[in-house]
């Protein structure tokens, strides 16, 4: 039986994959990329074992060093950084591990470039917002406002690099103070809502599985993670076939998500594709289709078709309880009564899990300590 290595950061994205595999009685090995070992993930009873490294390159070194011990292991990437690192080391790792990505080393990292993705999106017929590639303030004369800035490579940027700019002065500030050497600046679209198509590609896009779509009800700032409703594809007019064509053109195999924004006129705009497990993907598992497990089966001798044929679908509400509380309840943007009502209708939380309660308790303690420190600062 093949082992499974789940690798990524200290995030509910990684935990979602661990939980999905646990539903099928598989305990994965966690290769955690984190500055220290103070992680809620390490409190989980759903792991076979774990190892903590500080950087993605350290993770690659670990995989190379332990390639015979883990020979044949199925790898699942849960961050842009790890997806790119695996891609950049494919020629070294491919003989020992079942990797997500493409057969060509470096191709996924090239595809992560937002301008490259936009061009590919145009080729398959997506609506793509007008954009500009910006390296310095000398490049911004042609930009139209309002606009939104994004790191050209998500793995290289921070949340603060994503900003809505209403004038030249705003844009200059982001470029001068931001952490990126290069930005994609897009025309800002007034949205009605945003949605994701979370899926799995097998055999370089020969088979593309997209069970439903996630509609974000209350997005947390600077991220597409938020209180969401996962629904049937019958409830939205989405460019599914174009998405499958897009994935085939990338020649990618593995877990993915494709993000869209629908404007106030009903037009859908392609935002980007994530070449990894998505942070919201627990909604797909909760709805009845276990994509991480199907990826595991497709890369083992067990076969995946029976599992796929037995998959069901029901709509679910999913909440990232800690970011949602901090972003909306703690700041007073929504009332505690409203939040409790949303909790009551939530089917799945991104950390709270009765089968594995210690990670949740750890996060509660960490949140209370942070609030206490803020209280001390205010009173002093």
Predicted regions located by residue number:
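A short glycine-rich, hydrophobically flanked beta-strand micro-motif that places a catalytic Asp/Glu
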Residues: 253-265
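Active-site nucleotide/adenylate-binding loops and adjacent lid/helix of ATP-dependent enzymes
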Residues: 108-184, 189-190, 203-206, 237-238
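ATP-binding N-terminal substructure of ATP-dependent carboxylate-amine bond-forming enzymes
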Residues: 1-103, 369-379
């Amino acid at each position: 039986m093949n082992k499974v290595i789940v690798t990524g950061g200290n995030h509910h994205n990684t935990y979602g994959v661990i939980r999905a595999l646990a539903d099928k009685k598989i305990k994965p090995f966690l290769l955690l990329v984190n500055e220290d070992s103070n992680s809620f993930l390490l409190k989980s009873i759903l792991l076979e074992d774990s190892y903590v490294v500080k950087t993605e390159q350290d993770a690659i070194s670990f995989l190379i060093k332990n390639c015979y011990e883990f020979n044949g292991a199925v790898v699942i990437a849960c961050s842009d950084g790890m997806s790119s690192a695996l891609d950049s080391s494919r020629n070294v790792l491919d003989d020992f591990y079942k990797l997500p990505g493409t057969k060509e080393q470096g191709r996924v990292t090239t595809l992560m470039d937002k301008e490259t993705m936009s061009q590919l999106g145009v080729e398959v017929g997506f609506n793509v917002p007008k954009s500009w590639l910006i390296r310095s303030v000398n490049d911004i004369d042609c930009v139209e406002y309002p606009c939104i800035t994004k790191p050209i490579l998500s793995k290289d940027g921070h949340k603060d690099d994503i900003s809505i700019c209403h004038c030249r002065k705003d844009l200059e500030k982001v470029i001068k103070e931001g952490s990126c050497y290069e930005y994609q600046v897009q025309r800002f679209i007034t949205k009605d809502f945003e949605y994701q198509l979370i899926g799995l590609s097998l055999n370089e896009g020969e088979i593309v599985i997209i069970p439903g779509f996630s509609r974000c009800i209350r997005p947390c700032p600077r991220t597409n993670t938020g209180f969401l409703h996962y629904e049937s594809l019958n409830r939205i007019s989405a460019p599914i076939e174009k998405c499958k064509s897009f994935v085939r053109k990338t020649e990618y195999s593995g877990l993915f998500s494709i993000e869209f924004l629908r404007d106030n006129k009903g037009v859908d705009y392609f935002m980007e594709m994530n070449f990894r497990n998505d942070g919201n993907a627990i909604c797909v598992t909760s709805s009845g289709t276990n994509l991480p497990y199907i990826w595991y089966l497709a890369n083992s001798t067990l076969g995946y078709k029976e599992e796929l044929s037995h998959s069901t679908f029901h709509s679910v509400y999913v909440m990232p309880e800690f970011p949602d509380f901090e972003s909306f309840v703690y700041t007073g943007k929504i009332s505690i009564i409203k939040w409790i009502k949303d909790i009551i209708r939530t089917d799945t939380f991104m950390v709270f899990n009765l089968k594995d309660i210690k990670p949740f308790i750890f996060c509660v303690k960490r949140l209370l300590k942070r609030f206490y420190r803020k209280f001390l600062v205010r009173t002093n």
